[in-house]
């Protein structure tokens, strides 16, 4: 089976007919070789010889060598592949420049290598490692530069505020300041009104007490103000003149009551002053009394001592 496969592979890599002997023809003046063309021709000859040796070894071993894991195997060449290899040579170099054996080898047994296999072999040898690093480094640098540019743009956008937005913000700040000032003034007014309410409540309490005292005085004199008020409520006055007279009389009575109350208050204040003076006098008298008692006790002691001296 191995020999049959080898023969089948050889038939795949052969061309249609055997090579023919070509006459040696001189190069025309237009087909002179440049240095890079001679290097390309030498490289094609080297590839052809290496391919022939590889095919011989694979035929002796009984088949193709299995490629390593991760490397794609090169596909067997066909008639089209052999033509592509021949076309890969430089056009300026004629076919008569090479020997017949090398041309037949190149056209018959040169396998076309896939791009993936060449790239993997080149990577395995370590040829593209610096190139890859050279390519990745600028990409990373470009990525970092772009990120920095985007960040700077975002910061600029966030910091920049157009005039149309700044004006309403300033207006809002001014309005807030005015509202704070108004709130402070309102708090002050509230505190003042609360103090005034306390004062008014105290005054109302005093007036109620004064009213109670007045009613008590009227009752003591034989006037029932409560009954009179109830009767006046039950029997409403028909004539406005009577009501006016009653009001005038009430006003006169109130005036008199106020005058009497003022007089009594003055008398009370005078009595209070007298009481204070009498209290002061009493305190002074008590002090003098204590001093007299102390002096009397001292005199008694002195007299007793004198009596004792006389008896001696």
From Swiss-Prot:
Q: Which GO terms describe its cellular component?
A: centriolar satellite; cytoplasm; kinetochore; microtubule organizing center; microtubule plus-end; mitotic spindle; nucleus; plasma membrane
What function does this protein fulfil? Essential component of the mitotic spindle required for faithful chromosome segregation and progression into anaphase. Promotes the metaphase-to-anaphase transition and is required for chromosome alignment, normal timing of sister chromatid segregation, and maintenance of spindle pole architecture. The astrin (SPAG5)-kinastrin (SKAP) complex promotes stable microtubule-kinetochore attachments.
Keyword field contains Transferase:
no
Q: Where is the composition biased (Polar residues)?
A: 75-84
Residue ranges spanning the membrane: these are none
Keywords per UniProt: Cell cycle, Cell division, Centromere, Chromosome, Coiled coil, Cytoplasm, Cytoskeleton, Kinetochore, Microtubule, Mitosis, Nucleus
Entry keyword annotation includes Cell division: yes
As recorded in UniProt, coiled-coil segments are 169-210, 246-288
As recorded in Swiss-Prot or TrEMBL, the protein's gene is named: Knstrn
Query: GO molecular function terms here?
Result: microtubule plus-end binding; protein homodimerization activity
Q: Where is this region: Interaction with SPAG5?
A: 156-312
* Protein name in the entry: Small kinetochore-associated protein
Query: So which domain of life are we looking at?
Result: Eukaryota
Q: Where in the cell is it found?
A: Nucleus; Chromosome, Centromere, Kinetochore; Cytoplasm, Cytoskeleton, Spindle pole; Cytoplasm, Cytoskeleton, Microtubule organizing center
Compositionally biased spans, kind Basic and acidic residues? 1-13, 131-143, 166-176
> What InterPro entries does its record include?
SKAP
- Domain notes from UniProt: The coiled coil regions mediate binding to kinetochores.
Enumerate the residue ranges of region (Disordered). Answer: 1-32, 55-176, 221-242
Query: In which organism is this protein found?
Result: Rattus norvegicus
Q: What is its main location?
A: nucleus
């Amino acid at each position: 089976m191995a020999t049959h496969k080898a023969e089948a592979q050889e038939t795949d890599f052969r061309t249609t007919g055997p090579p023919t002997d070509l006459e040696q023809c001189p190069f025309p003046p237009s087909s002179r070789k440049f240095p890079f063309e001679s290097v390309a021709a030498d490289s094609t000859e080297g590839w052809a010889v290496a391919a022939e040796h590889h095919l011989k070894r694979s035929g002796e071993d009984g088949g193709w060598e299995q490629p390593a894991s991760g490397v794609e195997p090169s596909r067997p060449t066909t008639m089209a592949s052999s033509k592509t290899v021949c076309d890969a040579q430089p056009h300026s170099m004629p076919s008569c420049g090479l020997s017949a054996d090398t041309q037949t080898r190149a056209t018959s047994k040169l396998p076309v290598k896939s791009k993936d296999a060449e790239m993997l072999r080149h990577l395995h040898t370590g040829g593209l490692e610096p190139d890859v690093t050279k390519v990745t480094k600028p990409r990373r640098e470009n990525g970092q530069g772009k990120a920095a540019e985007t960040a700077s743009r975002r910061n600029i956008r966030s910091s920049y505020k157009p005039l149309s937005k700044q004006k309403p913000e300033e207006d809002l700040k001014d309005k807030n300041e005015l509202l704070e000032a108004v709130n402070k003034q309102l708090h002050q007014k509230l505190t003042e009104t609360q103090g005034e309410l306390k004062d008014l409540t105290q005054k109302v309490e005093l007036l109620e007490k004064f009213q109670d005292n007045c009613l008590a005085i009227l009752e003591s004199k034989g006037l029932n103000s409560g009954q009179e008020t109830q009767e006046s409520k039950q029997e409403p006055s028909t004539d406005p003149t009577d009501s006016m007279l009653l009001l005038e009389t009430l006003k006169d009575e109130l005036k008199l009551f106020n005058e009497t109350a003022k007089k009594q208050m003055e008398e009370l204040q005078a009595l209070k002053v007298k009481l204070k003076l009498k209290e002061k006098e009493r305190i002074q008298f008590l002090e003098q009394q204590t001093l007299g008692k102390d002096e009397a006790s001292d005199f008694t002691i002195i007299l007793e001592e004198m009596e004792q001296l006389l008896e001696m």
